[in-house]
């Protein structure tokens, strides 16, 4: 494997950077910073942490991802996909457990990038991605029901699981605060209609400003005090916290490792998906492995300053592009804008109604659900539908860690099944049609297969599934031949089970006095078989470069056998 080449886009672009680029990046960065504010606050609160932690994540992680990332226009920060995971970790392990898990995920992301696995991440089956993003969307919506309806649980703790939440909601639904519900509906309505008037100004920002001002006036002059705001639940600190490294112990690392894998996998998928979408719009090509390393560093550093998991955010990245962002400078400016807001304007956030943020997250969950794509996938092959539904329901009913683990296992099994089905083994006992061949060196009369010889043509990878198929085909033929020619010109690779199968076949054949000849082995498979020691068992004189040579060896062997 060649050495890892870490090439952040920022440093490669600075050579040709102009004042015009700086002007557009400054404007785009300011707009994206303002757009990111309500989302960072909403994601922070929904994740079970204070609102400023969401902003700190957008500042620290957003800055690092832009500084070191492999995409020109990627904007990093907290996203809705992590809400479910973060909430569950905090409930089970507390804030310190979240810090450890996030830092571990950062290390895993760095390793994914260093070992050039960025491309592999892109091959995670689409039904799995849609299954768990749709499941996350349903879960996010579920977590917002309490704030949408202003439910009063009278001290009862709301459980973390999906079914438990709805049971608690049902028990306390008689405590609905219709003012809260009205605020949520108005917020959703404003977000929905804003794009009809302006594509550049985000509806979430418009909704938060208008609704916050409206509720403030109602509280001041209308005597309405039953609408909860951020300030009613959280004390907001307008400052960056001191750096602090969590205490580490082996037991915590073992317990949090599965969760860290989930954060890393989800972060890798979302960031690379966002970067790929951006590439399609701006006509560029991101560096997946550099991007993963940057994401890893961001997730390792962010918790030290009180942040939560972060990744590339598609909505903010597209906002950056639509407002003229041309380089990572726009992402750096976005982080600086958020820092200034945190230091000087954060006290105003206490007036934002919780029901308004719930409305913002309802829209986020709707957009994330991809219900049209989900519906379309239900028309696909049954195997894909099974993976989609299992991943979806596991995400909703259990948690994302279980969903990803089970979904990936099922997808791998189905993939191997499909590879098995595509690999064909045919048996030829009379003659080979020269018109269908590409490796023949002599003319047609030499293509007749002698009596007592069978040619097995393998078309596809020779791995553990095919080994079993090979054995079944040989058993079904009944009469034992004197010579078996195994033609492997269309075998791209062979695994350990395939080698074991060939070894067993060779040993069994020798006991039965059946001669084995290999034909047309490609260089890669040849090297694997040679290193495994298989050729010593078979004998190098029985390894032929093409079918002509193999048939010639078979004829000579038949003559010798007949003499004896």
Can you name each region flagged by the protein language model?
Residues 367-537, 555-563:
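The feature marks cytosolic C-terminal regulatory regions of anion transporters and related permeases
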Residues 1-434:
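Transmembrane helical cores of multi-pass ion-transport proteins
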Residues 76, 131, 487, 518-519, ...:
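Active-site-adjacent beta-strand anchor residues
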Residues 28, 188, 192, 468, ...:
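Short, contiguous clusters of charged residues that form electrostatic/catalytic patches at enzyme active sites
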Residues 86, 166, 470-474, 550, ...:
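Generic hydrophobic alpha-helical segments
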Residues 115, 497, 545:
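Short beta-to-alpha loop/turn elements within the nucleotide-binding domains of ABC transporters
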Residues 537-553:
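Short acidic-hydrophobic, aromatic-tinged amphipathic segments that line or gate anion-handling sites
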